[in-house]
Amino acid sequence: DKGIAFIIGKTDGEMGLNLFSIFYSIGMHFINGPIYDERGKIIKYLPGSGTYTNCYMDITPCAVKIESAMEHAGITFVNSSFMSKVIVSPENYGPVKFVGCGFWGIQGLDYHGYLEGKGSVLFNACHFSGWDKNLKGYPCIYANNRDIFVNSCEFLNSEVNYPLIYLGPYVRNAIITFNISQSKFEVKNESFSGAEVIIKNNV
């Protein structure tokens, strides 16, 4: 419960398939990886990119932590399962995408997504179930990054009666459309005053 299952650094178009972990402190940890010169000396650290399909990070306080993703390529998860939350760090500049993924809660879970940084984060055709286990008022998705997209997702926690998504002051663009919730669909918008925010067609 103190280890990290997968540490991924400077990859360029990495393809991960059928990765699994359980009972680790972090399932997948994306970092700035070392770049070496011809003498084997580290000269700099750079983020990577890749697509990860059919991954299952089971029973963990943090399923995915992204410190940094390649700015022009990013990291994409497809048809994957995360039994807790994903964290995108303030240092991130690259796009992060979750497509057709499922999120489930564990005891004491707060958010399913805690997002910071200057990169974009997208959730498309995902479902969320079991955030804020102790009903303390945490949103499912805490977004305080530059760009956030939440589209065609399903929120299955019927016990909450407070906002599902929080938009913080560092948000510059947000598109939240065509989502379904078992409880009232509500977004708390505290984004930058000049932000472009579209919230519509949610039920």
What are these regions (language model features)?
Residues D1-V203:
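Extracellular/periplasmic carbohydrate-active domains that bind, remodel
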